């Protein structure tokens, strides 16, 4: 074995070039879920949401999501309006950038 043979990289399995199928969670109408865009952060786990039904709601980030997902202005989320106060909602899901692109291509996000 020569010194040149030692410097050659070993053949490793190349990553597959096939596109993987990822599932994107869509809002469920039976659970009263709606897509919304974060307009501004208000502090104390509250934010202003512009929902796809045209209503601007005050959103609340529940404790179960607080540490999992960092939400910023411009993010697309799924919100569930409160049954007794329609101008407030809970944020239950945050989309990543590739998921937002998929939602736009499929027509879930208007404009």
Swiss-Prot record:
Residues 22-96 form the S1-like domain. It holds the Pfam family eIF-1a. It comes from the Archaea. Keywords: Initiation factor, Protein biosynthesis. One of its GO terms (molecular function) is RNA binding. Disulfide bonds: none annotated. Coiled coil: none annotated. Residues 1-28 are annotated as: Disordered. InterPro entries: NA-bd_OB-fold, RNA-binding_domain_S1_IF1, TIF_eIF-1A, TIF_eIF-1A_CS. Belongs to the eIF-1A family. Seems to be required for maximal rate of protein biosynthesis. Enhances ribosome dissociation into subunits and stabilizes the binding of the initiator Met-tRNA(I) to 40 S ribosomal subunits. NCBIfam families: eIF-1A, PRK04012.1-3, PRK04012.1-5. This is Translation initiation factor 1A 1.
